[in-house]
Amino acid sequence: MKFTKMHGIGNDYVYVNCFKETVKDPSAVAKFVSDRHFGIGSDGLILLCKSNIADLKMRMFNKDGTEAQMCGNGIRCVAKLAYELGLIERETATIETLSGIKSLKLNITKGKVNNVEVDMGEPILIPEKIPIIKNESVRIEDKKIKAKFKINKKEFEFTCVSIGNPHAVTFVKDLSKIEINKYGPIFENLNIFPEKTNVEFVEIVDKDNIKMRVWERGTGETLACGTGACSSVVAGYLNNFTNRKVNVELLGGNLGVEWRSNNHIYMNLSLIHISEPTRHLRI
């Protein structure tokens, strides 16, 4: 199997061009390639596939083998790789995902993609569509879907958003003091989230800047998460903590996110890195 390993600000995946390769059991392959000791080492597996409704289709698998609806960092890398492999030949692209078709703009210099802007679509703020089960812990304030929990005498309040996949965003005073490996899996598996959830811990710097750490559903903590950054900006604006255009500082680097007046969220990264050359693997 021929593959390429790429990352967007540290959120790394193994990419396979399924226009030429066949992956019979992507769930099993995802588990293998994600292992940082006995595999290749990644946050998961992403397949570039043919589509009948877009330029191509992206399938994304977490490191535990589960298939996810969408990956913001991954889709930018897909666009870059697809262009440089000749699968698309324009500076715009449409990519089919389980959360719908996404539109992308590619900034190209000397045949290489150095910047990708993604239209992530509109945030989903309806409980049944996130999905989240309404109970005594969940309340709705205007457009905000709030959930409050006390764990080990520590209280957390979440704003819940979907960007094609579920996110629970909580705002904290000091991000460096958050025990993400302790609290991340607890919140990921709360029974109010029937499909589990991604979890973002966010520190407000000012109206234009936030810091974020993420616990990804099916993967654990990662260095970056594009849909998580978008969800955090939506939650920040709804709670009057931020403006609509925000710089999001993650462990792997910075992302620019803007929730525009047309209700669409746009995400921009100045450079996407290829961390390893194309390789061959026998599975």
Give the location of each predicted region.
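Acidic, low-complexity central loop/insert segments
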Residues: 63-158, 223, 234-260, 266
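N-terminal beta-alpha supersecondary unit
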Residues: 4-52, 190-193
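N-terminal, positively charged, Ser/Thr/Ala/Gly-biased leader segments
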Residues: 1-14, 18-20, 118, 142, ...
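Helical hairpin unit composed of two closely spaced alpha helices linked by a short loop
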Residues: 227-229
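Conserved phosphate-donor
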Residues: 38-57, 168, 183-215, 254-257
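Short, hydrophobic/aliphatic alpha-helical segments
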Residues: 30, 50-66, 146-157, 205-220
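Anionic-ligand binding region
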Residues: 141-148, 157-159, 170-191
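Single conserved hydrophobic/aromatic residue that forms the stacking wall/gate
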Residues: 272-283
